[in-house]
Amino acid sequence: MTTPIHWAWVILTASFITVFVNYSIRLGYGILMPEMIVSLKITKAQAGAIASSFYLSYTIFSPLLGFLTDRLNVRKLIVLFSFIMGLGTFLMSKPASLPQTCLFFAIVGVGSAAMWTPVVTLAQRWFGVNRRGMALGILSIGYTIGYGIMGLALPPLVVRYDWRTCWLILSLFAFALVPLNGLLLRAKPQDLNLRPWGEQPGFLPGNHLAEAKARIRYRELLKLPNLWLVATSYLFIAFSAYVINTFIVTYGTLELGFPYAQSAKLASAIAFSGIAGALIIPILSDFLGRKKCLIMINTCFALSALFIIYAGNNWLTLLLAVSFFGIFYAAAWPMYAATAADFFPRQATGSVLGFWTIFYGIGLILAPTLGGYIADVTGTFIWSFFMAAIAGGLGTFFFSRLKRPGEGEG
């Protein structure tokens, strides 16, 4: 007799597709950036400001959505903001000026704010404690594959049509998330009289329901030193990652002189090399611990930036450098999400992730504009990447001070 598929896997599939589309759009901008710089006649700093407009709105809305995720129906939130993301992506095919482009990408950022914290929180609700690393590792492949495919698919579309058509196509994928999530997502296992997949028999649905009613106050969370240590680490690691991610294709095209389609493969190398890291490192962390694995990830971010600088215009070495970066880039975000569930009260996961996203967003806002400005002033991205290496080191320092619950974190 065939065993029915646990609905947790349906949730994970829909979440996977949602993350895939979201990151195809979000990171697709960095791939399209060289063409948009030429077409819109903007500087690297202005191109960075467009990315920063996305991250500004993303940062403003993410804490609100984290708060609402713990209190409202997460399915309805994801459906609504999928539509907003689709609308903003459609408008990205229409801008005629820098202010318009910033506004339209900011709308995309509003929608995208619900495509990570609520989705990750939902996925964790459907899986047991010892299966979260696995589930989040699988989920994170969505953004690596999305980013990787964009590096291969967008350049031919730009050549045949233009960058505006690429945004139009991406908007269709975003709009498709509305019916997909509306039909498949469920807010919690108890809605279907299920317990999380992989949960031990001693954990009954009623226990989770009682836990959900025991709301933890935001003021109590803010007193926890661990909250601030991880948040600060998150800021620096986000800055480090997105200086590289935002500008690596532009660096290859406009500074090193590689053909556009070839430079776009640097993005694909980051993404596809990340599949192994996204699968192996989160699962490994279920046994070795999140802290050890995240210290390793932060350290390797710093080393990756230095490796990219060292590679120069040697294509094979550069490809190897960005691939090394990709392994740890893909694993970082689900690992931080799992840390929220492990080091803080379970019923506050959405609020914790939402709070951290403020700091994450600050790093993301600063990275494109500051990285682009330094490249304009110095005439090279080398100093921008060196700054990313320093940020990776600072991320390691702050995360290394994290204490396990009950070991004096207050």
Where are these regions (language model features)?
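Extracytoplasmic gate region of multi-pass secondary transporters
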Residues: Y29-M33, L224-A276, I281, A367
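C-terminal transmembrane helical hairpin of 12-TM major facilitator-type secondary transporters
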Residues: S268-I280, S285-T339
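Helix-breaking motifs and short loop linkers at transmembrane-helix boundaries and internal kinks
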Residues: K41, N73, K94-P99, G128, ...
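Conserved MFS/SLC helix-loop-helix module at the cytosolic interface between two early adjacent transmembrane helices
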Residues: I60-P99, S285-K291
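Paired small-residue
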Residues: G88, P99-I107, L316-F324
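Cytoplasmic helix-loop-helix junction between adjacent transmembrane helices
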Residues: F104-G142
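Helix-loop-helix hairpin linking two adjacent transmembrane segments in secondary transporters
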Residues: L139-L192
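Residue-level signature of mid-helix packing/kink "hotspots" within the transmembrane helices
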Residues: L27, Y55-P63, G148, A271-L279, ...
